[in-house]
Amino acid sequence: MRILPNISRATWFVGIFFVVNILLTACNQPSANSSAEPSPTETNSPVAQVTTDPYKDYKPRLNGKATVEMMVNGQPIIIEVDGENAPITAGNFVDLVEQGFYNGLTFHRVVDGFVAQGGDPKGDGTGGYVDKNTQRPRNIPLEIKVDPAVENAPETPVYSRALGNQAGFPVMLPHKTGAVAMARSQMPDSASSQFYFTLSDETGFLDGDYAVFGYVTQGMDVVLKIKQGDKIQSAKVITGQNNLEK
């Protein structure tokens, strides 16, 4: 699962549609036809069609916020995980942290000034979490919370649907320096364990297509020094454990 090929930063803005489509590359599932640009019927009011929460009983989920301490190169990175606006995405991450899943995994992809991506047990961008009890992969739905200021914005997140930045709908958890989000394949509901830190404010074109679930609150200097191959020495939940519902 890769969110960006080896292209220079200068090429990111050679057409947003082109770039976002490059971001959607296959992981451990076959590719599917997908476009980050909404169709004419979707552009008018894609969020108005959401009336119920199809994932209200999904677990694990984070009901509120939690704080995670991640150690990289001997230094701490503190992440505030937001289950208020991304309960399923945040719950998945916190659950994996509690299991010790990320300990020892590498950052297999780092693009200076853009993202540092890790969380793949295979270390090559093709892996994800497999439940130890069921021996089945866990994939979570794409989860985007639209800003309530938007007309007809639903109270719950929009699931399984890439809205795309081009739709013009501001999101509650935007991409900016220090955002933490899930990587995925071309399939909207393919995120598993791979996540990325954004290294620049010039990443807003990912809003609506990738699910941000938290932000770095301390240790951004550590994040900016991450190199490809660096390991997550440890990750632990230091506050908000009781907000995780399994």
UniProtKB/Swiss-Prot annotation:
Belongs to the cyclophilin-type PPIase family. The keyword Transmembrane does not apply. Residues 1-36 form the signal peptide. Pfam families: Pro_isomerase. GO terms for molecular function: peptidyl-prolyl cis-trans isomerase activity. InterPro entries: Cyclophilin-like_dom_sf, Cyclophilin-type_PPIase_CS, Cyclophilin-type_PPIase_dom, E_coli_cyclophilin_A-like. It comes from Synechocystis sp. (strain ATCC 27184 / PCC 6803 / Kazusa). This is Probable peptidyl-prolyl cis-trans isomerase sll0227.
